[in-house]
């Protein structure tokens, strides 16, 4: 069986693991087991410190926010039995002796393998505050407050920001750009914010979320900021960008990546076209539009658009006007073979991802802060993209076709 080609991110992660193993002098399974025990101890200690922060109402050394006559009083050591062996955990104390930790109760001397797996899973996935609280209470009988869980899950934010700033590949065959909207509290008001999302397909045909940015309502100006961020992280060229037809979007793209070809999403255009069409006309009108975007080539598509005008312009003149006004970016896909056309003529790749995000976030009608929104989206993204392990089935053919159309820009 041929060895699987790893992505640059997988190779980078493997390199970090190799460095960690070398730094920790890991050369046996016993050493690996010790490393796992230390990881569990580190996680437990972080959770305990976060709980004590919540109990006292201020973080360590944050004396200006201290509003209690209680204080920290060093640490005690507790030995736990785990499936990896015994682990020593440093438990923080308060001077009054009122601190009752819930992550690791005072009389608790062991944690089962199931709890260990759940702790590591929750730490990696960052379940919502309420979900974690309910899960721990119902399954393990441990009660924790919303704010304690929030403090613990907030540990993921630096990880999310590091991910957002990670280096990217120099060339992407296709990048899909779209926004999804949420309500967030800001200065005492509930405001609608856009989360700008970029998904790239690299030259190996592998899909990856390049970034997610929380900003104001969708605008070409903010997209320009997003595109500059992508460039600063290492992207030098994008062959094709797939977008909606937001005003000024193409100018924002070309200001950063002047050679990039733009394909407006046909599905977005169809939605806009059908928005004010009478129900009794809808089926016939959409069939005539299909003759435009499903044509064998651009000339046939223009002929079909002429026929559409003759039939529908008296009743719905703005539809054909919109198609003609946006034709330069709607018709890009006609120059390519069918395999490339299917890849780029809609933004289904990113819309499918957005649907999965909405499933995760649908119970949350309003987010308290931008950070709480980013945290949940990052954790949902990590879970969704676990399944993105392979490349497109027809990628070898697509790559060969792109090597012809983008010969001067394709690396050797």
Spans of model-derived segments:
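Conserved phosphate/pyrophosphate-binding and hydrolysis machinery centered on Walker-type P-loop NTPases
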Residues: 7-10, 25, 29, 33-42, ...
């Amino acid at each position: 069986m041929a060895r699987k080609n790893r992505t640059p991110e997988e190779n980078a992660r493997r390199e970090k693991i190799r460095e960690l193993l070398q730094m920790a002098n890991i050369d046996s399974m016993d050493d690996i087991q010790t490393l796992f025990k230390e990881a569990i101890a580190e996680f437990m200690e972080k959770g305990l410190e976060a709980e004590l922060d919540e109990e006292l109402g201020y973080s360590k050394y944050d004396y200006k926010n201290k509003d209690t006559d209680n204080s920290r009083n060093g640490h005690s050591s507790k030995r736990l039995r785990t499936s990896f062996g015994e682990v020593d955990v440093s438990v923080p104390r308060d001077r009054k002796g009122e601190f009752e930790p819930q992550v690791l109760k005072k009389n608790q001397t062991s944690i089962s393998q199931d709890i260990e797996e759940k702790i590591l899973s929750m730490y990696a996935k960052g379940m919502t505050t309420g979900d974690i609280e309910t899960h721990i209470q119902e399954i393990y009988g441990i009660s924790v407050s919303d704010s304690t869980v929030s403090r613990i899950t907030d540990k993921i934010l630096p990880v999310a920001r590091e991910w957002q700033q990670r280096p990217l590949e120099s060339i992407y065959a296709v990048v899909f750009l779209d926004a999804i909207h949420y309500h967030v509290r800001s200065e005492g008001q509930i405001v609608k914010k856009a989360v700008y999302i970029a998904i790239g397909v690299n030259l190996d045909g592998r899909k990856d979320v390049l970034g997610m940015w929380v900003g104001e309502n969708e605008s070409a100006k903010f997209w320009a900021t997003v595109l500059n961020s992508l460039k600063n992280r290492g992207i030098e060229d994008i062959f094709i960008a797939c977008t909606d037809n937001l005003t000024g979007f193409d100018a924002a793209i070309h200001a950063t990546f002047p050679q990039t070809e733009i394909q407006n999403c046909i599905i977005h255009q169809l939605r806009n076209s059908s928005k004010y069409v009478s129900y009794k006309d809808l089926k016939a009108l959409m069939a005539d539009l299909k003759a435009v975007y499903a044509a064998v080539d651009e000339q046939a598509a223009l002929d079909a658009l002429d026929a559409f005008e003759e039939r529908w312009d008296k009743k719905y003149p703005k539809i054909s006007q919109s198609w003609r006004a946006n034709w330069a970016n709607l018709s890009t896909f006609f120059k390519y073979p069918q395999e490339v056309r299917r890849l780029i003529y809609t933004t289904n790749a990113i819309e499918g991802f957005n649907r999965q995000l909405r499933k995760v976030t649908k119970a949350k009608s309003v987010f308290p802060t931008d950070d709480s929104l980013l945290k949940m989206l990052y954790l949902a993204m990590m879970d969704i993209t676990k399944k993105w392990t392979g490349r497109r089935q027809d990628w070898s053919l697509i790559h060969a076709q792109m090597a012809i159309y983008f010969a001067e820009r394709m690396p050797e």
